[in-house]
Amino acid sequence: METAYTYDGDGNIRTLETKAGENVLLSFAYQYDGNGNRTAKTGMQAALGGITAGNNALDISYNYDVRGQLLEERRNGASVCYAYDKAGNRIRKTDAQGETRYLYNEKNQLVEEESPADRKQFSYDRQGGIIEEKNAAGIRLFSYNSRHQQTRVETETGSVQENRYDAEGLRFELLENGRRTSFVYHDGELLQEEGREEQKTSYHLGAGMEAFRRGQELSYYHRDEQLSTVFVTDGQGEIRNSYQYDAFGMSLGTTEKLNNRIRYTGQQYDELTEQYYLRARYYNPVAGRFMQEDVYQGDGLNLYAYCGNNPVVYDDPSGYKRKACPPQGKISESVDESGTSSVAKPNHGQGFSSKGYNPKPGERTRDQRL
């Protein structure tokens, strides 16, 4: 499995091509404006069912306002448009389904979202976290601990997710309707999870997630320019999982044969709550906003906005502050059949290898290098 990149003079990705043997899984070319905003993405990706089953063409363009906020994403001719107020709150979204409107209070907290399909109302605690969402299906409840970390979500159907955190603030345990999953991290990156059907999943790190091993089976991640998982393949190059997202990470289509939580921008997706775990906070990709205030206050006065409303160029894996995604600079990556991963880029050491290492849930690991 191999991904090749070319770059322009500013370090922006110009082309991306991912191959499984001689077969092309992904092939894209990109264009940028004078401010470094990505304005076009054109190319193809393999169709689900195998690399010989045909290809899907993609032609995506992006338009921005003078503040760099995304105004329009046009995908194969279908347009999604956004409008914002002076504080950077999304006040309107228009797509093929119609118009969605958003209302806010004086604290930039979303209090109502009305779409052609539903009307949602939100309530907050004193620390600025959503504690209640009322919608057509019922009521969704959220709870937090003294550090204002989200500890419990009860959905409209009565399903419950509980989150537990270690002393450094990382989620080391997750309970979904009582089913427990434990996590091990390396330098803040997910290294291992254990709990689903008693199976252990080990992740192999490079420029993000490269592969995962579950039992004797090694599966490979294939990612786009935002490091979002597009495909998961097996060792023979057969596509097992396929994902599509809009610019803000809302799912446009998911097909899975393998359980996988690593999705948009390479981060953990919680299916039960439909949120992304971004360490300090949880992100709602449908609303394009965080569920809690930013205690760091690193990205302006709006404490809920995701990446300054420019998710095409930036991501926020810490939940504190946006960063360029991917960082400017050349990236090369590969994973061999043993599961050893490597990466090389400016100011970055050799890749981390978890080959042969078996940490315990909750354990901190030392840096192991090839």
Residues covered by each model-derived region:
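A motif-centric feature for acidic-aromatic and gly/ser/thr-rich catalytic loops and repeats
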Residues: 34, 59, 92, 100-106, ...
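Beta-strand elements of repeat-based all-beta scaffolds
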Residues: 1-21, 27-55, 59-63, 69-74, ...
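Low-complexity, glycine/serine/proline-rich disordered segments
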Residues: 312, 318-370
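Short linker/helix segments within small regulatory modules
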Residues: 296-300
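OB-fold/S1-family RNA-binding modules
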Residues: 205
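Short, low-complexity export/processing leader segments characterized by acidic and small residues
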Residues: 232, 250-252, 281-289, 301-337
